Amino acid sequence: MSEDLPILSPIEARVLGCLIEKKELTPDVYPLTLNAALAAANQKTARDPVMALEQTEVHRALKLLEQKGLVRQMFGSRVERYEHQMAQRFSLTTPQTALIGLLLLRGPQTAHELLARAERMARFSSIEDLRGELDMLIGRRPPLVQEIPRGPGQREDRYVHLLAGPVDVAALSAQRSAPAMPHSDLEARLEALEQEVAALRARLDALGG
């Protein structure tokens, strides 16, 4: 028996993706405080599009995600903390959850892009292993992921999550992608610094209440 998927707004999708990402990348400060979730949502790296959200917007998104059964608020701390419930809600493996998180944070991506970007969140033995996990997400009822056929100027099919509702396959297929850029040392260092700042902010939240 299948159930309808929850439909997420762009802000809800961003916040949910951040919780999925930070659980794997900064487990020592997870579940996230509101301030940590805000910083993660507004990161300049590993986000497409880059957003400039207000604290009230992120807080509202967290509460709406909680109502939809995708996020749970943790109690017993001086500050509110939130954790995602994607794996429990949809019976997902860690690799499948990581793939959904990347699609929530960066939009449509090829299998090779996902393989490179998932490196610190989940382990895939090969591109075929990753495609197998994507096929399982596509084959669910209802599906969580959809494959977008390659369009003009594109070398590979892309994949998109379906948590924001049905997608316009023709429009996405015709959309020209920017050339894939290598993950430069500078970008890697910037991303690491943003992760460190987010972790420090979360620790300060825990100390200061």
From Swiss-Prot:
InterPro entries: DUF480 (IPR007432), WH-like_DNA-bd_sf (IPR036388), WH_DNA-bd_sf (IPR036390). It comes from the Bacteria. Pfam families: DUF480. PANTHER family: UPF0502 PROTEIN YCEH. Belongs to the UPF0502 family. This is UPF0502 protein mll4256. It comes from Mesorhizobium japonicum (strain LMG 29417 / CECT 9101 / MAFF 303099).
